[in-house]
Amino acid sequence: MFRTLHQVLRLSRAPGAGGAGTPPRQRKIVLVAETGCDLTPERAGELGVYLVPMHVSMGLETRPDGSFPPEEVFAYYDRTGEVPQTSAASQYDFERVFNEIESLNPGADIVHLAYSASTTASFHNALMAAAGSGYRVLSVDTKHVSVGQAAVVIEAARLLREHPELTPELLGAAAERIAAKTHMCFVPQNLDYLRAGGRVSNAAALISGVLNLHPCISVSDGRLVAGRKYRGSMVKVARRLIRDEAQAHDFRRDMLYFIRSPGLPDEVRKAAEDEARSCGFERTEWVRTGCVITCHGGPGAFGVVGFSR
């Protein structure tokens, strides 16, 4: 658990705030996130998290994220030379999910841990949906995408389970602290999707004809930003990326998430697991990207998400 969260939990035990010496809160808190966080429906169900669909457009057809496998993104690109366009969860999408939550959990508080507001309108659309609903909804911009957002959601869900006395405001403050200590980056196997996509800030500066060039795409203040470059095989890149990120952000060693898009070779997965063990990580978990981030990373991408001490 994050040390900074202990301060939040102490606040929850202050007079009038619930916690020690007072009954648990009677109103349930329900967590919400977008499908772009790449939690599977099964994992989200285990955590008690409701998922709101983002969208992917291929030509004139727009489909909900999660309703088809990401391999179809690759097939569309191979066929057309165009990367599918991603779009936010709409106001209607949030209204539908908020209504479902209210019908199953009357009077519940809703805490929405949002996909980065700098990259999509989902956060704004959730605010609009909440304003017209009359429900108790708190939206928090995690300033993360994909597995970075998932890591924040997972930690917040664990915190809520362990401390049901938390108010939505305290849980939201805790989620912001978690997000500030969460660091995500990934490395595409090739540059094709970055060239065709255009969603990554300053990506053009890293695109060249050099073979085996792998730009590291990190999340900075909610935006995807191209940073340092790696050369060589993805096996070597994966090992170096783990070492570099663990050192740069002083990662806690209790948990490290691995990001993989479809097509990542098994030898890269094994190398990553071996490197994580040698760096002292106690647990690792692989998360397969969904359609939204796959549109940016392409096939065979590898990344990590960790937590600063």
What are these regions (language model features)?
Residues 3-4, 10-27, 36-50, 55, ...:
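Mixed-charge interfacial surface used for oligomerization/domain docking
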Residues 98, 102, 114-117, 130-137, ...:
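Generic hydrophobic/packing signal
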Residues 33, 114, 260:
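Short beta-strand/turn micro-motifs composed of small residues
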Residues 29-95:
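N-terminal glycine-rich anion-binding loop in soluble enzyme alpha/beta folds
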Residues 93-123:
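N-terminal glycine-rich phosphate/adenylate-binding segment common to multiple enzyme folds
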Residues 84-91, 112-119, 142, 146:
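Short gly/ser-rich anion-binding loops that grip negatively charged ligand groups
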Residues 58, 62-63, 70-75, 98, ...:
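Broad hydrophobic/π-residue packing in well-ordered secondary structure
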Residues 1-9, 80-84:
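Short, basic, glycine/proline-bearing loop/turn elements
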